[in-house]
Structures are given as structure tokens and as C-alpha cells.
Amino acid sequence: MKYPIGIQSFDQIIEGNWVYVDKTDLVYRLVTTTKTCFLSRPRRFGKSLLVSTLDAYFKGRKELFDGLMIAKLEKDWHQYPVFKIDFNGVNFTEKGNLEATIEYYLANWEKIYGETPREVPMGKRFEQILSLVYQQTGRRAVVLVDEYDKPILDALDTPLEDANREILKAFYSTFKGADEYLRFVLLTGVTKFSQVSVFSGFNQPKDISMDNHYEALCGVTQVELEHYFAEPIANLAEKFNYTVEEMKDVLKMQYDGYHFGSGLLGVYNPFSLLNAFDMNDIRDYWFASGTPTYLIKLLRHNHEQMDELTGRYYDPSMFVDYKADVEKPLPMIYQSGYLTIKEYDSRRNRYLLDFPNNEVKKGFLTMVAANYFKPQEFEVSNWIVDAVILLEEGETTAFCSALTSFLADIPYDSHGSIKTVEATEKHFQYTFYLILRLLGVYCQLHVEKTQSRGRVDCVLETKDYVYIFEFKLDGTAAEALQQIEDKGYATPYQTDTRKVTAIGVSFSSETMTVEEWEEKTL
């Protein structure tokens, strides 16, 4: 079985006999019910392949679709002039690159369809080209724009951001003036910018990003997983000595969990899934493929906010449109694929957002922790794995020593301007939020969503042990231990056959590390 990793060309996949998950019934629905539309999906989720599929369809390449669902639906197979704009592969942090890229496309089209006046704006030139095409062919044009937002994302939080936005706004205004010459328009990207920015120059495209009809347009559903990939699932199960059903559960926890609408149809990350099958191994493929620069920039502006974003209900207006505000990172984090919809409250029209799966949870929290604590990401990741091993083996003293050393190694400047009591409490709570959530990737974690000032409590469960922690700021370990008993945190585990240990930890605001700890077997 051949997996098309990195291949975004529909014709190459079909002609090369690579695995193709048939989405053409959704493609047919899209092109027959919509004229101008926009789709937001995370990076490496199949947007470019979708654009390539539409390109082949509108060029009437019927032979490529033999045996696919659309072959039974489409009867006419008309050929349309297709204008494909791909902003991938260009660095838009340098002034002039966006204008040069658009000029490249316009010049090539003018070679085919005829010259247009150079003194008019780029958007008007494109409109003239579309008019010429209609006059010459008698057919309306198809425009496909892949990664429409990359010129803005590349320049996020720089002076060039506004300049690139204005250029795109003027260029995309073409679609309003040239409406009579257009058969179909699709813009894909990661982020939907607010309606007053890029899209304000032309008729609003239909946003299908959260349309339940197109939840599975990109990615792999559970039904598709079992239909197309039974063989590689069996291979993985054999390697890890799992049953096939157990292996499916592992894949679901690691790569599934995306939901793109109120229908809550689960979608697997296709990039990670294909890599796992190709390598016959479970790794963090999507996250390892790179962290977008724009996300790193957002994290620099938002530290303590991150623990407030997950596991909460939101009105869709709070995460659908990005307003280029680094102080409000939720839309960018959601649309980039680091958070996803987990539940839908239809009565109040609210969505619960959280991490989609273990790969993203581990990778995102590690990245945030490295950005906050300042060590390298691999150092955070290695420490977490070592700490989990100690907990799994019941080595509580070694774990507390490792925790003390980790906190002591955090550079002083990473504490920022922690000079007030409020800032110290915030640093204390956020520090342990990150550490506990990372441990929770490997252990079962129960942590209070709302913590009292100056304390954090949680329960970590492994196969053989249950640990009840109370972290106290500028208190004593004995007081923390007493808090565990007073609150009755161990009561649910009275009949548990695992060893239950209460651990009280005191955190010093002066040294910014563990001052003392005490433990008690319950």
C-alpha cells in the first residue's frame, strides 16, 4: 500500500495508484450547490489536495475519476478555464514578495489570454483577464486560491501585516466586479480574518468551515479509516502486540478527535495517520512537522491565558473570526488545529473547545511550557517522560527531587516581572497547570478547573498507584497534607486496590521552587 505523504496533486495520486480516500461525493455537492466559498482547516489537513481535485474536475478530466463516487453523479463533465493561485512556498515577510507573486500569475495568464492595461490596479487586471476568458471561450472561469491568508500570517505582528492585508483586499475585490464571469470560487486557508479586513472588497463567500455537510471534506473519518486502512492497522497491532480493536483505540486517542461542526463527526489528522501507517509506528508526526511562526508570536504575548482557553464553552463569534489581535489568541489557536470542538450546546449555541487528541495536547503544552520556562522543548518533553516513569514505579521521593531540580533550573528571567503577590500566585498556578497537564498526557489526571488562591490540588492515576497532590504557595508541606485529609480527597479511592499516596508540596515564592514535601500512604 502506497501512502501519498507530501503529494498534493490529485492526478499524481490517481495515476500513481497511491491511496486516495474518496471525497468526491462531497466535491460534487460543493460545486453544484455553491458558487463562492471559503474553507478553513489546519495545516497539512488536505486543503491543497482538495484544490487539486477541484482543478481536475473543472478541467473535465473524467478519466481520473473513474471508480470514484462522483463518476456516478456527474453526467456532463464540462471543461472550464481554471485560475489556480497557490501562496504556499513563498516567504511573505519580505516587502514586495506578495506583489511579485500576484504579478507572476497575472503575467502568465496574460500570455495565454491577452494583455491588459498595466497602469490599472492588480485586481482590475485580473477582472479584465476573466472578461477576456469569457469572451474567448464562452465559459465562466473557476478561481481556486490555496492558502489565501499566508501573506498575512507570515507577516503577523509586523508593519508588513497591514500592507499585505490591503494588497490582498484589493486583489480579492476582483470577485465582486467579475461576478458575471465566474462559475466557482474557493479560497482555502488556516484563518478566517474578520469581515472588515480581507473579505470586505467583494461579495461575502459562503463559509463552509463549520458546515455539517462538509465536516469530512478534509481528514479521515472512522468509517474511512476502517474501510481503507485495515491492513496497516493490523500491521501496527502485530508490532505492538495489540488486538486490532486495541490498536484502533490507540490511533483514536493519538490522532482522532477533530470536529468541525455541530454534527460532531470525528475526523483524524490525515498527515499523522498516513505517516503512522507508512512508518508502522506511533509518533507525533503532525506536531514534529513544524510550529507556525505566527503561533510562536502569539505565545510570546499570552502566557497565563493558555490555561483559561481549554475545556470551556464559547459562542462561535469568539473563535470563528480572527481580528488580528494578539491579545485574543483563541481564534488563531482553534483554526490552526490546536483546539477543536468537543461538545455542542444547541440550546445556547455554544461550543466546548479542548485539545483534539494526545498528539496535539502533548505537543502544544510542551511548546507552551518551553516558551514559558525557557528550556528547549526536548528538555521539557524528556523531563515529563522521566517524571511519569518515576510515578509509574512508585518513586515519589525521586519524583519530588526531579520536580525541585526542574523548577530550580528555570532561568530567573523567565519568571518575568514577578514582583507582586498577585503575579507570584499567577506564576505558581500556571507553572503547576502546565506541569500537571503534561503529566496528564501519560497518566489519568483529575485537576480542579478553578483553584483557590495560593494552592493547586490534583489526582494522578497510574496502573498501580494513585497520587493525591496538594501544592501550596508559601505554606508548609504539613499544611498541604492536612488539606488533603480535611477535604476528603482520598474518599473515592477507599476500595481501590492500587497504592494511594497523599503528597503535600510547599512552593516558595522566594526561591521559585519546591521548599519541602511530605507524603503519607492512605
Features from the language model and the residues they span:
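Conserved catalytic cores of phosphodiester-cleaving nucleases, focusing on short active-site segments
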Residues: 432, 456-473, 487
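Domain-level recognition of nuclease-like catalytic cores that cleave nucleotide substrates
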Residues: 492, 498-522
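Structural motif
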Residues: 142, 465-467, 501
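Mg2+/Mn2+-dependent nuclease catalytic core
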Residues: 162-168, 473-490
